[in-house]
Structures are given as C-alpha cells and as structure tokens.
Regions:
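Conserved phosphate- and dinucleotide-binding cores of soluble alpha/beta proteins
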Residues: 2-46, 60-76, 88, 94-104, ...
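Acidic/glycine-enriched edge-of-secondary-structure segments
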Residues: 23-35, 51-62, 403, 564-584, ...
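Short active-site oxyanion
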Residues: 33, 85, 110-112, 242, ...
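Glycine-rich phosphate/diphosphate-binding loops that line cofactor/substrate pockets in enzymes
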Residues: 42-53, 147, 201, 317-327
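Glycine-rich phosphate/ribose-binding loops and adjacent secondary-structure elements
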Residues: 45, 83, 304-307, 312, ...
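Buried hydrophobic side chains on well-structured beta-strands
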Residues: 56, 87, 330, 353, ...
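Short helix-capping segments at alpha-helix termini
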Residues: 76-81, 345-347, 597, 628-629, ...
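Amphipathic, Lys/Arg-enriched alpha-helical "gate/interface" segment within cytosolic domains
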Residues: 113, 556-674
C-alpha cells in the first residue's frame, strides 16, 4: 500500500517502498511529485547509510542544520543506525555545552572526522584525542576550498598553506591520534618550491541550511548571516552521487524565487526539510538579527569602552600597529578587543575588518555570534574569502597566542588532552602581510592597571613563552625566511620575530626586566641594548588619540637608517603631496638626513597609500632624480597596490629613471643584497 508523506507545506509525495516513507530519486517520480522535494527531517536522514561521509556545514552556530543533526542523533539512538559515519566540517559547530556536532558523539555513530576547528565541540575533541575515532585536523581554509575542488573533480588542492606546521607531513600531516593512519597530505615540489597537496574529500551526504526553498529545491539564504561553502558542498556531494539535504525556514511557491537570490540551485538538492524555529537560530547566540544578514544597516551607536584591564592594554598596543586603508582579520577571543579599541578611538572608518567565514567590512561580532558582522560591505562565500586571504589580500592580522617558543613558533591548536584545532589560523597567519599575535604574558595574568600603571601581583603562574611549543600551528622559521613582520604583544612586553628567534623590544614602564619578564620566559630572548618602554598611553584611562597617530605621522618619524647594511628607509605610507610646498618639504628633510650619513646609501621607499597630485608629477620626479644622483647607491620602492606600482613605474620610466618597484618591503630589500 502506498505511503503518503505530508510535508510541512501541505504538498504530497508518494512512494511505494514497503512501509517506509522515503523520498525517491526524481527519475522514479512522476507528475507533481517530480518537483516536490519537501520531506520531514526523520524521513531525510533515513537515507543515510552506514559508513557515509557527512558534510556538516556551520561556523560556531551559523549555517548549522540543527534540525537535521537532531534527527540523525534520534535515529541512531532509536535504531542503532547509521553507524561508522565520517563527519567532514570546516568548523565543528557548537556552544561547548552540548549543541552542534557534539550531538553526534555517540559510540558507534562516528568512526572518522576531518575538520578545521574543533574547540566548540569538546565531546568530539575528546573522541579524537582519546583515540576512539580516526581524526584529521586540517586548515579551515583548506577544507573550505577542498569542497570546491572536490566538486570540480580535481584530485585535491595544492597550496603552500600548512608548510612547517603540524599539518606538514614531516610533522604528522594533521593526524590527531595513533589510530589515524591514512595520509591526507603530501609534500610535493613544483618549480623547485615546496607545496602541500591535500587529497580530495570523501563526500556522500551534505547537511546544509538556507532560508527559503521552493518545491523544486531551489534555496535562498536571505536571513542567513553567512553563506559559507553551501553551494560548493552541495555541488561536491551531488557530483559524487550523494545526498544533499537542506534545512530551511519556509517554503515558497514554485517559480517564485528570484534566480539571483538562489544560492543553491534545485538540481543539486535531494531533500528539503522545514525546521522548527527553535532549531533554526541564526547564530547560537542570537535567534535572528537582520543586521547580521545584511538586510538592514544598524544605526551606529556608541560602543561602550572596554574596562581598562590587561586585555585592553594588549588590544590598545595591537591597535597601534594598524594603518589607514588596511584590510584586517581579527581572530576570536582577545583580538576581538582590537575592534572595540578601534571603535572607541574613532578609526573604524579607516579600516576594513574581515572575518574568515565571509564578512568583508563592518563591525565583527563576538562570542557565539562570532563570524558574522554588523553593517558589512559584502558577505563572501568562505572559499572565496580564503582565496583572498591566501593570495595576500590581508594587510594585517591580529590573532590569539596560547603558547610561543624561542623560534617564534605559536600553538593555538592542541594542549595536552584539549583539542582546539587550527581553524583558519594557519591560512591567516601564513598569508597576512603583517602579523600581530596577542595574549597575556602568563596564565593567569596577575596584572592589573592602577593609577596609569601596570601592577603585577604575586602568585603561581604558568608561562606561555616556552622553549618549545606543544604543537606548531604557526612556524616562526617559515615566516622569518619569508621576511614576514611578526609581533608578539602582551601586557608586560612586546617581542618580534627575527631569523635568530624572538627579540624582546619593549617592556611596560615600572616593571623589572629580570623579575617580571625574564623569570617567566622558558628561554633567553634576544635583547639588543635596552628595550624601549611601551607607550604609557595604553595604561591610562581616556582616549589615546590613536586617530591622530594613524592619520598624521610626523615627518621626522618616517626615516630609519640601518648602519650595518648602509640601508636607508623612507616611509611615505599614507602621505599626500598636494602642493609644491609639500614636495619641497619632503625633499629638504630627506636631503638633510642623507647628507648627515656622509656617503651614498641603499634607499628603500614605502609607497603604500601614497598620493601625489597629478600636477606635481614633474616636480616630484625631478626631486627623485636629484636625490638619486647625489645620495643613492641604489634605490628600490614597494607598495601593496598594483595600481600604484603600475602608475609609479610608468611615471619614472617615462622620465628615464629605473623604477625597481616591488610588492613587499622584503622584496625591495632583497634587490640591494643580491
């Protein structure tokens, strides 16, 4: 006897498979049933087989198909099937209290897991660390991009992301435990350069989420905070002959959805499930905010300043490293405070803040809302966001730091039996043009601010700066070889990465170098002379005046001379030359400083965010020619702007000057050292 399934929108699908209600493949259906893919969650998950690899989409709680996950858990608890599944995820969604992927952590349900971030699903992490399942931890961006490459039928992904870290096969290949023997990462050589090859993902089922579906399975995402890699995952699973199930809030009439709004076309979708509202929160922290989904822009209100604690001290010092017109990624946790400081100091409008799952611009959110943004300029698909990151699109990144060692390696992914996972950390840290790690100096901090001073209390602490980190999530050696500028900012001191290891460059005023700093470091840092004192403003209540610092660097602060290499640095970043007096002023100051050196120098000039009024081009190039003839043994220039490189190169070449213009400071310096 046919079984009648009444989907939530009242449409009817029939099939004749015994007494079980199962949606049939389209080629077996006819008439109206050919188009109607709406079923219940229980019916959808009954198609999952033992041993299937299930994509569980989500970021914290955004995009997470909770209705489907609960249905799968309930089926297993009632029937004992399906068994031995593989969970595949970029981020293991969760709230650390049992929601998210932790719902699937029953003995026998999972056999394997492949994912980027694990920290929000502690039960899943315990299964992996406890050797109860096979488990790989790969970079979040790599997993995200693998959905796209797997969809295209490629054998995998080739990238430099992960070299020198724990996912490098020379350091374990991302295997979490002894039970895991499968190699998913290979070291390869291309044109004399090392790369990592990540194998395509095994994919049989996808749990995805949208806002609206029509009976044909076309999916829109207008109320979602993120789009993540939903379309890529759906394509990958569909092309593998698998099952794509999408959880939505509502059903629209057939043909009523605008094709421009459809994020997942119906040809990729097998089942649509209308969720109960309580299982379809926009994030795990907020049921719904139209500001997160970009449906409206929130009126900018005054953001309450952070309390003046050691965390604000660190965030303030990190904010001092930001430059106007920079594209920045802020990590979760302490780095979130940098956005608060930027808002308080009125410099948000001069920065483009981003988050790895997709938001571009706006104000990043925090806590269980993390990953979304208010008033963003765009919401990118996650693979595209990581393309932007991996290709060098980030001017700066501020990331957390749980452990660091003498060579500048950083661990944020694993601490004994606790598994956090790498998340997007490896992609971001390896690719940002400037990297700023932030964290308290020891645990617990034992520091507080009183009367404009940092005060250290007595008590037992655990060091965070160790001889060697437990796991290498960031390779200091790789970064140093690439010439990447890296700072390690704490409330007590600031260190920087050098080819020889970490150098202590700043300490907080009033602290004792031996007692308060060196006694709590597991190695002897490089110290050249006396470390500078950290800016006293970061310990003082009230505004620091960071906007003035950001927009108006004094001319005298734009010069530096490296005696050992006879290399002179001129920082023109953010300068605007609008009048002939501006050109004369910079020329006079440069000539004065170069004349004082007493010999010709190797000149390196930073042209990031530089503007020259077109009518001043001849006057400026005449100045450059005069300086080159009298003071330069050689000169190189650099800017991250491809347009500026092209324009400057044309203007100099047309006037008979060799441009020698590069994308990075390191490339410009390397030219002189050949």
């Amino acid at each position: 006897m046919p079984v009648v399934v009444e989907p939530p929108n009242g449409s009817v699908v029939t099939d004749v498979v015994g007494s079980a209600a199962l949606p049939l493949p389209a080629e077996f259906l006819g008439g109206a049933a050919l188009r109607d893919k709406v079923v219940t969650a229980a019916e959808a998950v009954r198609l999952i087989r033992d041993g299937d690899a299930v994509v569980v989409e989500g970021f914290v709680g955004q995009g997470f198909a909770e209705e489907l996950t609960l249905a799968l858990e309930n089926r297993f608890l009632l029937t004992g099937t399906p068994r031995n599944l593989t969970a595949v995820f970029t981020v293991a969604s969760g709230d650390r209290k049992g929601r998210g992927l932790d719902r699937l952590c029953h003995e026998g349900l999972l056999a394997k897991a492949i994912g980027g971030h694990w920290g929000l699903s502690p039960a899943l992490g315990k299964m992996a660390v406890g050797n109860r399942i096979e488990a790989h931890n790969l970079p979040q961006g790599v997993v995200s991009q693998l959905f796209r490459d797997t969809a295209a039928g490629k054998p995998g992904l080739i990238t430099r992301v992960g070299l020198g870290t724990f996912v490098d096969p020379r350091n374990g290949g991302g295997k979490i435990n002894e039970r895991t023997t499968e190699d998913r990462v290979e070291l390869i050589m291309l044109n004399g350069q090392e790369y990592l090859f990540y194998k395509a993902l095994p994919l049989d089922v996808a749990f995805l989420r949208g806002t609206t579906a029509d009976p044909e399975g076309n999916i829109t995402m207008e109320r979602e905070a993120l789009t993540l890699e939903a379309r890529a995952a759906a394509t990958a699973v569909h092309n593998a002959g698998g099952l794509v199930i999408v959880q939505v809030e509502r059903i629209a009439d057939s043909g009523s959805l605008s094709p421009r709004d459809v994020k997942i076309p119906g040809v990729l979708v097998d089942c649509v499930v209308v969720s109960q509202p309580e299982h379809h929160w926009q994030t795990f922290g907020t049921q719904y905010s139209p500001a997160f989904s970009g449906e409206l822009r929130r009126v900018r209100s005054t953001i309450a300043p952070m309390a003046l604690t050691e965390r604000k001290v660190i965030a303030r010092r990190a904010a001092m490293e930001l430059r106007p017109d920079s594209v920045v990624n802020l990590g979760i946790g302490l780095p979130e405070g940098v956005a608060n400081v930027a808002a308080e100091e009125h410099i948000l409008d001069y920065l483009t803040l981003t988050a790895e799952p997709g938001p571009m611009g706006g104000m990043p959110t925090a806590g269980l809302d993390f990953g979304s943004a208010v008033n963003s300029q765009a919401i990118m698909d996650q693979p595209a966001q990581f393309d932007f990151y991996d290709g060098g699109g980030l001017d700066a990144a501020v990331l957390g730091m749980a452990q660091a060692d003498r060579m500048g390696n950083v661990n944020v992914s694993r601490f004994g039996s606790r598994l956090a996972g790498s998340g997007g950390f490896i992609n971001i840290s390896q690719s940002a043009k400037k990297l700023i790690f932030v964290g308290t100096f020891v645990v617990p901090s034992r520091a507080h601010v009183a009367d404009g001073r940092l005060v250290i209390s007595d008590g037992i602490v655990s060091p965070k700066f160790l001889a060697d980190v437990e796991q290498r999530t960031f390779s200091g050696e790789y970064a140093a070889a690439a010439g990447q500028p890296v700072l390690y900012i704490t409330e007590r001191c600031v260190l920087q990465l050098t080819p020889d290891g970490l150098e202590l460059i700043e300490i907080a005023p009033w602290l004792d170098l031996d007692k308060d700093i060196l006694a709590h470091i597991g190695f002897t840092p490089i110290i050249k002379g006396t470390p500078r004192l950290m800016d006293s403003r970061i310990f003082t209540a009230g505004l620091m005046g960071l906007k003035d610092d950001l927009l108006a660097m004094p001319l005298e602060a734009r010069f530096a001379y490296d005696v050992a290499r006879n290399m002179f640095f001129l920082n023109m970043e953010g300068m605007s030359l609008l009048t002939e007096n501006d050109v004369e002023a910079i020329g006079t100051e440069v000539e004065k400083r170069l004349a004082a050196v007493g010999k010709k120098v190797q000149m390196v000039v930073n042209y990031d965010n530089f503007y020259l009024a077109p009518v001043l081009t001849d006057a400026y190039v005449t100045l450059v020619r005069r300086l080159a003839e009298h003071y330069y043994a050689g000169v190189t220039r650099y800017t991250t702007s491809s347009f500026m490189r092209l324009k400057l190169s044309e203007q100099l070449s047309q006037r008979g000057l060799a441009p020698h213009i590069y994308e990075s400071r390191q490339e410009a310096m390397n030219w002189h050292e050949k």
